[in-house]
């Protein structure tokens, strides 16, 4: 049954990624090969901006499925792990209290909930360094990126790429099944997203374990809200349905949440296909894997001392969708001397609109993405790029030397969290051709230092060809022209006769023609404006969309120059 649901969900996703002109005749079979390749050499890497862009489009495509992404996976219910997917060593119902805080106690209302109490097991300032296995496919990386984006959008939890100074971090890799440790355990801790786990709701679930949460149905007050059908539980698995004792978990002032993404499904550990848990509230459903409930968001923000969003949302208005602005000179060619009209620099964002939507914005700014793709960074990381009107509540951005001075502001003690609308889908990424020979990953230099140019040549030729020195330029077939080339930052323009005659001619190309910097003319022919070259036209359907998304600059500039020169003004 799960395979049919997957086909229903993924079909529109492939259509959204490929576009209306590139839909394949039939989808590939949905198996593990679509999600990861365990035969590939395994090493630690991080997500890229392209993963987050693709994740946004996949999420938008799935939104058209009317929220039917609710199926629960058997991969979450391992007989060998505590409660099916908790990987902490020697953790069970009898040791959970000792694990959480080593003592006993009682909340004010006598109830215990599902967050750890020991503050040492929380991630400092909500910053969670991570690495991700190189074995995941682009589709899987994008869903993981979309899930991390959910945390950045609704909580102050920031999943950030691991840095050299980070000793404690989460490594995500495709082991057998789905599992995670609860909270920060110290050092490198594993989080598995293997077979049956590449689904956004399950990814959110496992990441929330790492944030510091147990399952909802293990609360002390759970018997007031659900009925456990003990006769339907697999033999020996009754211990997976124990409740936590006093002193084990944190009181966060919330009622029982049937809709929590941390709740078991109705048939967890079932021996006969019948429900093992039944809600006592009429019409309530459990085990949803659509996304955070309002209470989930409230609990995460409360546990980490963030401005609260969720069950008690803030009253600030949501921001509008990101506006991608590409500043390009506009050239008007007439019979008069040319007039260059330039668009004024992008207006700094208002404080109400200025918020980093990703946890790794500072890292991306340091890697130069504010310059390489300013449109995308303005929409996702305006604070880090200094694109905001300075206020006391604005974080300190990473300051770069650009044509527009960055605004330096003060970093607050705690990030300001505001509810926002889901990001709109972005246009498809332009494909990268081998002849462009550009690095397509931001961590290429790191991979080069780890000798992957030798041990994984095929992978590095595809993603880090420039850093590895795999770029190939064919020998010239014509005699090169050694005359100096004038490089200008302004587009080619056609000049009137008076301006042309005032310029000194370039060295003659033939006995009958004289070359000028921008216009060719003969001594006998009357003046006429030189038309644009016939090949200066867009060759792709999505050129205008790619331009508005900022792809005329950065790593895709060579591709856009070849395929979308008219839209990008690169003729």
Curated annotation (Swiss-Prot):
GO molecular function, one term: metalloendopeptidase activity
Annotated segments matching region Disordered: 407-426, 500-530
Signal peptide bounds: 1-15
Enzyme Commission designation: 3.4.24.-
Tissues where the protein occurs: Expressed in pharyngeal marginal cells and muscles.
Compartmental location: Secreted
One GO CC term on file: extracellular region
Positions of the ShKT domain: 354-388, 437-471, 536-571
Keywords: Disulfide bond, Glycoprotein, Hydrolase, Metal-binding, Metalloprotease, Protease, Repeat, Secreted, Signal, Zinc, Zymogen
Enzyme class name: hydrolase
Cystine pairings recorded for this chain: 156-306, 178-197, 354-388, 361-381, 370-385, 437-471, 444-464, 453-468, 536-571, 543-564, 552-568
A Pfam match: ShK
Active site residues according to the UniProt entry: 206
PROSITE patterns per record: ASTACIN (PS51864), SHKT (PS51670), ZINC_PROTEASE (PS00142)
Cofactor, how bound (note): Binds 1 zinc ion per subunit.
Predominant subcellular localization, coarse grouping: secreted
GO biological process, one term: proteolysis
Cofactor(s) required for function per UniProt: Zn(2+)
UniProt-listed InterPro entries: Astacin-like_dom (IPR034035), MetalloPept_cat_dom_sf (IPR024079), Peptidase_M12A (IPR001506), Peptidase_Metallo (IPR006026), ShKT_dom (IPR003582)
Cited CDD domains: ZnMc_astacin_like
Domain Peptidase M12A: start-end pairs: 114-307
Residues binding Zn(2+): 205, 209, 215
SMART domains reported for this sequence: ShKT (SM00254), ZnMc (SM00235)
Recorded superkingdom: Eukaryota
Function text: Metalloprotease.
Designated name of the protein: Zinc metalloproteinase nas-15
Organism: Caenorhabditis elegans
Organismal lineage: Eukaryota, Metazoa, Ecdysozoa, Nematoda, Chromadorea
